[in-house]
Amino acid sequence: FNGYFPEIGARMTTCSFKETEAYSVCGRLNGKHKDKVLVVASAGNTARAFAKVCSDNHIPLLLSVPEENIDALWFEAPLDDCVKLISPRHGADYYDAIKLSDMALQSDKFFAEGGAKNVARRDGMATTVLSAVTHIGRIPDYYFQAVGSGTGAIAAWEANLRLIEDGRFGNHKMKLMVSQNAPFVPMYDAWKARSREMLPYDDDQARLDVEEIDAKVLSNRKPPYGIKGGLF
């Protein structure tokens, strides 16, 4: 179990399963990045998880989070000064936060976390499936998740394939049941059209749709959808 529900053993104090990826990503850092600052763009919950883990372990971190999503950055204790924050102004969305983080990455003082392409991020999130399977005793028939980038669903699928290779928990593949928050549904629209490529989405309309949804963390306009190994 993930999130925060101590009665059933879930003790992630950020209340987000994104802690699973923050620990694995930070644990995989090596000397190559010594004296450099890790950069993470986020719509909110990933930033909260990385801020906690980096603060607790004194890992220099630069977060890029849309100004409208800053209320997602709550913590049970003050953060260490090694964690810094930049934000695109009011009216911007997650994609704008990514572009702002890319500007910082033009300096050799910073390095990118990597997002869905970082195997440590996917393997970290995959632990939710590994934990479920070892408790249930078999690979589930269905996997449900709300998605912004779809990285969690990709991670779940990769875990499923490894469990099949392991052989102790069955040989079937879960049906991934992923959802988005209307009216911001770019992956749903592409899937419905059976298109590997994301459909055209006007930037201004996308920002308006993001303002309307409740789940701001699901607002990735450029998800790893059509790439090889992506959600499609």
Q: Where would I find each of the regions flagged by the language model?
A:
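PLP-dependent amino-acid enzyme catalytic core
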Residues: 1-232
